[in-house]
A protein has these predicted regions:
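Mixed-charge, Lys/Arg-enriched low-complexity segments
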Residues: 1-11, 51-76
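Acidic, low-complexity, intrinsically disordered interaction modules
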Residues: 17-67
């Protein structure tokens, strides 16, 4: 499966108004330095000590938003 990884700070910039809000991210344990990744389906996963947890998802045209903000492309 392909992902783009980023920090919580970058995720905050990407998330649209009709998606997760700051309080939702904080409740899921996401802070500025948290490592997160998004797959091509828009699922947001947060890095935990022993794996990854899905905490929500992005909607619509998130592909361009992610690639523009991170400067990265999808990686296996």
């Amino acid at each position: 499966m392909s992902f783009i990884e980023m920090t919580g700070t970058t995720l905050e910039k990407i998330v649209a108004d009709d998606e997760l809000h700051h309080d939702d991210l904080a409740a899921a344990g996401v802070n500025d330095h948290t490592i997160v990744r998004v797959n091509r389906q828009g699922d947001i996963e947060v890095r935990r000590p022993s794996g990854w947890d899905v905490i929500g998802g992005l909607l619509g045209e998130f592909d361009e938003r992610i690639r523009r903000e991170t400067g990265l492309d999808w990686a296996e």
